[in-house]
Amino acid sequence: FKCCRLIFGEADHFPGLTVDRFNDILVAQTLSLGIEVRKELIFNLLYKILREQGEEIRGLYERNDVKIRLLEGMEENKGWFAFAETAEPGEPLTEIVENGIKYNVDVENGQKTGFFLDQKYNRQAIAKIARGKHVLDCFTHTGAFALNAAAGGAAAVTAVDISAEAAQMTDANASKNGLDKVVKGLKANVFDLLSELVNNKSREF
């Protein structure tokens, strides 16, 4: 419950609204005008319910930096939602644990809401087939697939992303889990790298 999707749009009868929980931070993305005009009510109720259940929530960060909002006359924006009862929430960074692996999550700059929660079981599957293998993780983002492969016994994992910040985050997450001798983040264009590897007969992958 510390790391999960709390509201999943139409499936939960909130069309255009996604709310993810990452430890002590909620992250919301509002894509419909109908939800936008009611978000203050919804967010405050959600916060109240969680607090009444004894959950520690530092704040709610809005990730509305998506162009689809323009189609409904809404502006792109991101930042902390102002709860009346909460103190200054601080940095939009937190730590989560999934499949026994710890991650730093940047809810301000990470893709989507900061972490791809829907890939949890795919990451588990990777861990089961990675033992002894040399693994190439493309579009690594936070290094989640790479770290699960390493935790599953991979001999070596190269985690590639065009973002230098993503590669650095992967290295930091690997170090946090004692997997830095196995996982290495690499800043590179995946498509260029794959073309090079096709012609590299000595490649390990």
Language model regions located:
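Conserved short alpha-helical segments that host acidic/polar catalytic motifs at enzyme active sites
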Residues: F1-G9
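Non-catalytic substrate-recognition/targeting regions of SAM-dependent transferases
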Residues: G9-D20, E40-F115
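Short histidine-centered catalytic/ligand-binding loop motif
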Residues: V27-K39
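Short secondary-structure junction motifs
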Residues: F1, E55-I57, D180
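Phosphate-centric recognition/catalysis
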Residues: D24
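Rossmann-like S-adenosyl-L-methionine
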Residues: E88-F205
